[in-house]
Amino acid sequence: MKVFHILWIITLGAGLWACSSASVFVQTDRVEVNSTISPDDTLQAFIAPYKKELASNMDRVIGFATDDILRDRPEGALGNFVIDETENYLKEDGWLEGKHYISIMNYGGLRAPISKGDITVGDIYRLMPFDNTVVLAKLPANELDTIIAYLKNSGGEPIGGFQIDGENFGLNKGVTLKDTLFVITTDYLANGGDNMNFFKRSYEITDTGIFLREALIKRVEALDTLRPLLDNRIKW
């Protein structure tokens, strides 16, 4: 009985301790980071080889541009390059076999032009600094009308697989409007980014796991020479 009494007291004490709140004292100091702070020599020495390796990779020449490749609206050579070479990469990788597809990216996602001359890995990173992946969205074919309305409202985005001329539109050879249509885009846009809400009505969305930036790097390496292309994809 005495042992039971002692155990009961220990259990009660543990319960009261668990229910009580503990105070923790935290002290912080505000450290302003500005140009007066000297680099840490040890840290600098540690990161130096990684920095050198990164710089070496970013400076690696992968192709040549015959002229500046710029973004523009309603159509720009930079957007056409991104669209066309994304499609070409997916074709080579077997993703588009037997599919009727179009493509749409976003003007705002093209962060830097490709300047005339040597093209480096760093140039493609500046163009595409985000880790966006390439996605195939399966949409009802009648959503093409919604996409065109979106393009009219935005003033134009990079597209492929169809053309717009005022109130009229046409599909590229080999593309037909059946019950469904595959749309090549990015994971960001497929999730409704830039208010592309028509993707929310997708039957299915397949993320290829291919980083858009890496696909473009490989395509530039394969092409070697880039020439700006404008082919009247959008005319208002």
Regions found by a protein language model. Name each.
Residues S21-E32, N80-W236:
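Feature captures C-terminal
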Residues S56-R73, M196-K200:
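Acidic/histidine-rich, surface-exposed loop or edge segments in extracytoplasmic proteins
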Residues M1-L7:
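Bacterial N-terminal signal peptides that target proteins for export
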Residues G15-A18:
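C-terminal motif of bacterial Sec signal peptides marking the signal peptidase cleavage site
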Residues L43, I47, E75, G79-I83, ...:
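Generic structural signal for well-ordered, non-membrane alpha-helical segments
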Residues Q27-P49:
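Post-signal peptide N-terminal segment of mature Sec-exported envelope proteins
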Residues P49, E53-S56:
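Anion-binding (especially nucleotide phosphate/pyrophosphate-binding) glycine-rich loop
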